[in-house]
């Protein structure tokens, strides 16, 4: 058999080069909107395939989770150590309306807090808000030296740690989380009011510093309610409502006259 190119085989090959299709041609961009409790509402954009047959674009967007820095949401660089998770709940036009879905600390902030010569105290508790959200709050605190203390170390005893943990749970459940809804609770996380209350309450047991709600996980959410979501977002309405136009009383609308024989 002669060695060489078989021309008949190459002629029988169907088609030429494969057509290059842009993957973004069949996709649409949607704006992500944060709840009204944050200063900056436009979080960013997200991509989804267009509606094709039974595959609806808005259904593909729902329940997506976005992680955003609190510094971007509130335009404050001092809050850059917090990461906020937002979950897409509904789509209104080209806007994706989100709801708070958790919070966490950045790794560098958490590591900067842990130091020698002090005791780290952690506690976590499950709470239920008035609007039926079940959350798990993780609290972290560190002991500090008393006023006029000469000794370098400030280690707390086991009995004191147990008392502080008990106080943490009490404040997180009774005084804070269980008496408010999710929107009000998020408003307490940002200025760290829960941490300040814990620090004040445990002053008699052992002085604390750097008391934070370091992490929030949502364990269970209630059934989706569009009206409640609209309350969280504030400037959106559940349906498009037309604007009423005032017409002067003396203005008469002329009716077109019928021309006979035209």
Curated annotation (Swiss-Prot):
<dbReference type="GO" id="GO:0003735">
    <property type="term" value="F:structural constituent of ribosome"/>
</dbReference>
<dbReference type="InterPro" id="IPR027500">
    <property type="entry name" value="Ribosomal_eS1_euk"/>
</dbReference>
<comment type="subunit">
    <text>Component of the small ribosomal subunit. Mature ribosomes consist of a small (40S) and a large (60S) subunit. The 40S subunit contains about 33 different proteins and 1 molecule of RNA (18S). The 60S subunit contains about 49 different proteins and 3 molecules of RNA (25S, 5.8S and 5S).</text>
</comment>
<dbReference type="GO" id="GO:0006412">
    <property type="term" value="P:translation"/>
</dbReference>
<dbReference type="Pfam" id="PF01015">
    <property type="entry name" value="Ribosomal_S3Ae"/>
</dbReference>
<dbReference type="InterPro" id="IPR018281">
    <property type="entry name" value="Ribosomal_eS1_CS"/>
</dbReference>
<keyword id="KW-0687">Ribonucleoprotein</keyword>
<keyword id="KW-0689">Ribosomal protein</keyword>
<comment type="similarity">
    <text>Belongs to the eukaryotic ribosomal protein eS1 family.</text>
</comment>
<dbReference type="GO" id="GO:0005829">
    <property type="term" value="C:cytosol"/>
</dbReference>
<keyword id="KW-0963">Cytoplasm</keyword>
<dbReference type="GO" id="GO:0022627">
    <property type="term" value="C:cytosolic small ribosomal subunit"/>
</dbReference>
<protein>
    <recommendedName>
        <fullName>Small ribosomal subunit protein eS1</fullName>
    </recommendedName>
</protein>
<dbReference type="InterPro" id="IPR001593">
    <property type="entry name" value="Ribosomal_eS1"/>
</dbReference>
């Amino acid at each position: 058999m002669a060695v060489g190119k078989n021309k008949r085989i190459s002629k029988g090959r169907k088609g030429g080069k494969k057509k290059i299709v842009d993957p973004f041609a069949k996709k649409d961009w949607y704006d992500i909107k944060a709840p009204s409790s944050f200063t900056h509402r436009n979080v960013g954009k997200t991509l989804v395939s267009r509606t094709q047959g039974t595959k609806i674009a808005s259904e593909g967007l729902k329940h997506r989770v976005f992680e955003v820095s609190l510094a971007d949401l509130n335009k404050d660089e001092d809050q850059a150590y917090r990461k906020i998770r937002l979950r897409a709940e509904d789509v209104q036009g080209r806007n994706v309306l989100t709801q708070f879905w958790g919070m966490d600390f950045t790794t560098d902030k958490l590591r900067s807090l842990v130091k020698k010569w002090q005791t780290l105290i952690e506690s976590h508790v499950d709470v239920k808000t008035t609007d039926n959200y079940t959350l798990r709050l993780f609290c972290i605190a560190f002991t500090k030296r008393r006023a006029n203390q000469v000794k370098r170390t400030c280690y707390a005893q086991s009995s004191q740690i147990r008392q502080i943990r008990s106080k943490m749970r009490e404040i997180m459940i009774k005084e804070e989380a269980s008496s408010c809804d999710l929107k009000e609770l998020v408003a307490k996380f940002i200025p760290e009011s829960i941490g300040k209350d814990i620090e004040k309450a445990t002053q008699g047991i052992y002085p604390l510093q750097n008391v934070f709600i370091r992490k929030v996980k949502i364990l269970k959410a209630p059934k989706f309610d569009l009206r409640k979501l609209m309350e969280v977002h504030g400037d959106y309405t559940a349906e498009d409502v037309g604007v009423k136009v005032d017409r002067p009383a003396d203005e008469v609308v002329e009716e077109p006259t019928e021309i006979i024989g035209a």
